């Protein structure tokens, strides 16, 4: 006996009753150790804190789904350790930091920043077998005012990259860094861990069309007046990431070319949103805290502080000054991205031609994930200093009839 298949007439097509909820892409959503994306992200150095925030007071940090204790010993060396003491499991968050490392509050076992157990005061001769009680640890290095950790296979540890726009500072220049907040130009938030998936924020870098709608027409002018011009866009897969060129024909006869970059595994390079001309001067890292949170770290080359001051989103108010009704009426990046859910349901998406950059970035990222799964080294990972300088491509460039404007301080 054949099964009767109900026919839905046009009047009832699209009923929510018939909707089958989608699901996140499992290859992209999970960041824990052993997952495809988790192992991919662990092959790169990840910022975990501002250098200035790492002191001799232990602090808990959560990165890539792991809870860890971060501190700086009295000799000035940062350390990142598994928090449960290898003696009987007490948290090293309650430890005291000394010249050589961190001492557990319970029975006084002392661990160096590389996890070596240096002293067991209740044991004969300070612990005859203390070398067997090594505390799990991750290597850390400091650069650009940030503390970076490598959380991948030890035998695959790359050199810490350098970025050309943050190198060879001229007299009077310095690097300004911040952490937290859902986007570099918005308010800092009390909890630096933003409550949704890191990829929802990072892939936004390759979506120039949302700037035309969300930031320029739907919610009024949130950035610069010329963003309300619909651009012509070209996306390009490059070694180490994806970039786009967006061209706008301005009313004064000039043409504006804007270049954004998304670099593996989670780096963004965006020029000034006031559209001032010249090479971009800052980069950001969109670091996965876990599957449902991320944290931003940003570094800017500058001569003046205040590069990350909050913008005025509406009626002269910054984001934290807006009421909930104003955020509903004039949403920005946080509302659009958090509105997708803690982890978006990729299975429900209907990507269109304007999503070419998103599709390209995801496809390129999946290729890098596959390389890691096959035992290879993903793009942007290098094992000698000579190859570790990364060229950043971003900027606002104005073309006139006789020249291109490129410089701005």
From Swiss-Prot:
<comment type="pathway">
    <text>Aromatic compound metabolism; carboxydiphenyl ether degradation.</text>
</comment>
<dbReference type="InterPro" id="IPR015881">
    <property type="entry name" value="Ring-hydroxy_dOase_2Fe2S_BS"/>
</dbReference>
<dbReference type="InterPro" id="IPR050584">
    <property type="entry name" value="Cholesterol_7-desaturase"/>
</dbReference>
<dbReference type="GO" id="GO:0009056">
    <property type="term" value="P:catabolic process"/>
</dbReference>
<comment type="subunit">
    <text>This dioxygenase system consists of two proteins: the alpha subunit (PobA) and a subunit (PobB) that acts as a ferredoxin and a ferredoxin reductase.</text>
</comment>
<keyword id="KW-0408">Iron</keyword>
<keyword id="KW-0001">2Fe-2S</keyword>
<feature type="binding site">
    <location>
        <position position="210"/>
    </location>
    <ligand>
        <name>Fe cation</name>
    </ligand>
</feature>
<dbReference type="InterPro" id="IPR036922">
    <property type="entry name" value="Rieske_2Fe-2S_sf"/>
</dbReference>
<protein>
    <recommendedName>
        <fullName>Phenoxybenzoate dioxygenase subunit alpha</fullName>
        <ecNumber>1.14.12.-</ecNumber>
    </recommendedName>
</protein>
<keyword id="KW-0058">Aromatic hydrocarbons catabolism</keyword>
<dbReference type="Pfam" id="PF00355">
    <property type="entry name" value="Rieske"/>
</dbReference>
<feature type="domain" description="Rieske">
    <location>
        <begin position="45"/>
        <end position="149"/>
    </location>
</feature>
<comment type="function">
    <text>Degrades exclusively diarylether compounds having carboxyl groups in the 3- or 4-position. Yields a hemiacetal that spontaneously hydrolyzes to phenol and protocatechuate.</text>
</comment>
<keyword id="KW-0479">Metal-binding</keyword>
<keyword id="KW-0614">Plasmid</keyword>
<keyword id="KW-0560">Oxidoreductase</keyword>
<feature type="binding site">
    <location>
        <position position="107"/>
    </location>
    <ligand>
        <name>[2Fe-2S] cluster</name>
    </ligand>
</feature>
<dbReference type="GO" id="GO:0051213">
    <property type="term" value="F:dioxygenase activity"/>
</dbReference>
<feature type="binding site">
    <location>
        <position position="104"/>
    </location>
    <ligand>
        <name>[2Fe-2S] cluster</name>
    </ligand>
</feature>
<keyword id="KW-0223">Dioxygenase</keyword>
<dbReference type="GO" id="GO:0051537">
    <property type="term" value="F:2 iron, 2 sulfur cluster binding"/>
</dbReference>
<dbReference type="GO" id="GO:0005506">
    <property type="term" value="F:iron ion binding"/>
</dbReference>
<keyword id="KW-0520">NAD</keyword>
<keyword id="KW-0411">Iron-sulfur</keyword>
<feature type="binding site">
    <location>
        <position position="85"/>
    </location>
    <ligand>
        <name>[2Fe-2S] cluster</name>
    </ligand>
</feature>
<comment type="similarity">
    <text>Belongs to the bacterial ring-hydroxylating dioxygenase alpha subunit family.</text>
</comment>
<feature type="binding site">
    <location>
        <position position="215"/>
    </location>
    <ligand>
        <name>Fe cation</name>
    </ligand>
</feature>
<dbReference type="InterPro" id="IPR017941">
    <property type="entry name" value="Rieske_2Fe-2S"/>
</dbReference>
<feature type="binding site">
    <location>
        <position position="87"/>
    </location>
    <ligand>
        <name>[2Fe-2S] cluster</name>
    </ligand>
</feature>
């Amino acid at each position: 006996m054949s099964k009767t298949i109900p026919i839905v007439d046009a009047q009832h097509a699209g009923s929510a009753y018939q909707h089958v909820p989608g699901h996140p892409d499992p290859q992209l959503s999970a960041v824990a150790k052993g997952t495809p994306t988790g192992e991919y992200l662990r092959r790169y150095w990840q910022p975990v804190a501002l250098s200035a925030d790492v002191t001799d007071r232990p602090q808990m940090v959560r990165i890539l789904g792991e809870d860890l204790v971060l501190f700086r010993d009295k000799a000035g060396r940062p350390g990142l350790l598994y928090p449960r003491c290898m003696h009987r499991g007490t948290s090293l968050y309650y430890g005291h930091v000394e010249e050589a490392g961190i001492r557990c509050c319970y029975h006084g076992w002392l661990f160096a920043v590389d996890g070596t157990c240096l002293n067991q005061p209740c044991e004969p001769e300070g612990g005859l077998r203390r070398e067997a009680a090594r505390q799990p640890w991750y290597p850390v290095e400091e650069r650009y005012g940030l503390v970076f950790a490598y959380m991948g296979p030890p035998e695959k540890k790359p050199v810490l990259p350098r970025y050309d726009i943050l190198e060879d500072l001229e007299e009077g220049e310095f690097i300004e860094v911040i952490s937290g907040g859902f986007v570099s130009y918005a308010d800092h938030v009390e909890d630096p861990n933003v409550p949704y998936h890191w990829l929802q924020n990072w892939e936004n870098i390759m979506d120039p069309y949302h700037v035309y709608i969300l930031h320029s027409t739907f919610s009024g002018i949130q950035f610069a007046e010329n963003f309300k011009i619909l651009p012509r866009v070209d996306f390009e897969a490059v070694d180490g990431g994806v970039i786009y060129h967006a061209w706008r024909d301005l009313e004064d006869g000039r043409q504006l070319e804007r270049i954004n970059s998304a670099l593996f595994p989670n780096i963004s390079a965006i020029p000034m949103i006031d559209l001032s001309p010249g090479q971009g001067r800052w980069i950001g890292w969109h670091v996965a805290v876990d599957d449902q949170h991320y944290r931003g770290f940003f570094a800017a080359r500058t001569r003046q502080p205040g590069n990350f001051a909050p913008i005025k989103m509406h009626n002269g108010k910054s984001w934290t000054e807006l009421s909930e009704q104003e955020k509903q009426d004039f949403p920005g990046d946080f509302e659009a991205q958090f509105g997708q859910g803690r982890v978006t349901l990729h299975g429900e998406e209907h990507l269109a031609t304007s999503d070419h950059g998103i599709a390209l970035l995801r496809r390129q990222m999946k290729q890098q994930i596959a390389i890691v799964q096959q035992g290879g080294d993903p793009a942007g990972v290098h094992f000698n200093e000579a190859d570790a300088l990364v060229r950043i491509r971003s900027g606002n460039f104005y073309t006139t009839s006789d020249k291109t404007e490129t410089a701005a301080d």
